[in-house]
Amino acid sequence: MPSERCLSIQEMLTGQRLCHSESHNDSVLAALNQQRSDGILCDITLIAEEQKFHAHKAVLAACSDYFRAMFSLCMVESGADEVNLHGVTSLGLKQALEFAYTGQILLEPGVIQDVLAAGSHLQLLELLNLCSHYLIQELNSFNYLDLYRLADLFNLTLLEKAVIDFLVKHLSELLKSRPEEVLTLPYCLLQEVLKSDRLTSLSEEQIWQLAVRWLEHNCHYQYMDELLQYIRFGLMDVDTLHTVALSHPLVQASETATALVNEALEYHQSIYAQPVWQTRRTKPRFQSDTLYIIGGKKREVCKVKELRYFNPVDQENALIAAIANWSELAPMPVGRSHHCVAVMGDFLFVAGGEVEHASGRTCAVRTACRYDPRSNSWAEIAPMKNCREHFVLGAMEEYLYAVGGRNELRQVLPTVERYCPKKNKWTFVQSFDRSLSCHAGYVADGLLWISGGVTNTAQYQNRLMVYEPNQNKWISRSPMLQRRVYHSMAAVQRKLYVLGGNDLDYNNDRILVRHIDSYNIDTDQWTRCNFNLLTGQNESGVAVHNGRIYLVGGYSIWTNEPLACIQVLDVSREGKEEVFYGPTLPFASNGIAACFLPAPYFTCPNLQTLQVPHHRIGTI
């Protein structure tokens, strides 16, 4: 029999694979460290305070730009067997070398300053980063000033920011427990603290008083004009501006300070124009944005006047008792539902809606009001020209726009009107080409977008229209994939999303729409998303924050009941979109409105960054 040919290894195997050893890097570094300890195969000796340390040039150059330049450029030390290091202690160099060869270091109070000096001198950036994190963990009310000086000396930006954040958070406590120390703060540190939006533990009057005391301490008057720029005089009331600020000798002696106070007084005199006159000196300080809910209609048919915000201070019980996390603010002058809200310059505007009269009859109104988060108060503004409910209100640049809706006679309107805060006046602009109500709208890309709705002949719409304010005209865009009424619309990045609402089936009966459709503003194209609402929602409020769309309350045509749920659509990560339930409303409500505004610091000064709890259903 003929002998079988033996196959070579190369012929038996196919393909190629990249193989990786997880222990190789560590074992090589460990071997180099052992060589350093034994003093073998080393090619450089470093000397600090007459103490010698053996090392490898390649290892040092890989860790430090300082050594890379020393050993690779035409420097005297590049060919030397020994290098004397000045400005580095032997203890600091020992610790730095230990880190270079192991990636670890034991930091403690007795060595930290030597390690910082060595890390800074030798440009061991990762070592300095570890030192910063160690010092941040040690930061407290007794050492914050010393740690700031260390951060400044060694250019530790992470530590410097941590000290600023610590002071912003604890300034009120420090003024009570260590007031004299606060008055010795370096100017650069105080400046960063006073300019912070998160300095909410003190009133603006208290911040002003601190600035004055600091200026008078050791006569720091050369900083006065610049420092007073960080006082938000517009947040003080008129009486305070007159009695505390304008009459103060420091203000009277400074043209800049006088101008700042007069600017604030002029701001207060122009009550209606304040939203479009916002500057850094009139903007409220706040810890974070949070979700607000306004008005609505309860099961008992009564109209709600309350303004509430979600207060996530109590994170421990947030998932279990989310209702308890809603806090009340000053209520609206009158309860209303199916109204609209818009935010301009951190002021909340409420317009139109349906109100309940003493006779029990309900009808649409034209009234409008404005909420001031600085004083937790409401003010009436000029009423709209038309009574409106089931309409759209949007803020663009310096104007509000009210679009369509139903009037007090339940007639569907084609009209559009614009509100000018400076004049406190509404004027008509270009109307629709047809009457429309129960539509949805949102401002995106500097334009007002309107989708769906129902006409005065009860025709459900799938149209998408956009209003161009500069040309005062409506432009038709690609229609939605299906008709929707009582739905919601929101924008994230350059996409519009339509959610909820209902349509009509072949028998002309209403059906819930759980599909979510998105519209690409750049391509004028609609796409059906591969994720749906968990339950249908009509007549809901809608708000957007950090790539998440919040669908608030509403009505279910399945149960004929108002809803207390909040559904959250997270579209912040493309391909990983998610729909889940957020916190429960304090009561079931339809015709409710929602928005995001700065959290009110006068009721919760230590409110942390918003983390709305949710019951995660799972990634879609």
Curated annotation (Swiss-Prot):
SUPFAM superfamilies: Kelch motif, POZ domain. Kelch repeats lie at residues 290-346, 347-398, 399-446, 447-494, 496-547, 549-599. PROSITE patterns: BTB. Keywords: Kelch repeat, Repeat. It holds the Pfam family Beta-prop_ATRN-LZTR1. Residues 42-109 form the BTB domain. InterPro entries: BACK (IPR011705), Beta-prop_ATRN-MKLN-like (IPR056737), BTB-kelch_protein (IPR017096), BTB/POZ_dom (IPR000210), BTB_POZ_KLHL32 (IPR030570), Kelch-typ_b-propeller (IPR015915), Kelch_1 (IPR006652), KLHL32_BACK (IPR047028). PANTHER family: KELCH-LIKE PROTEIN 32, LD33804P. This is Kelch-like protein 32. It comes from Homo sapiens. The gene is KLHL32.
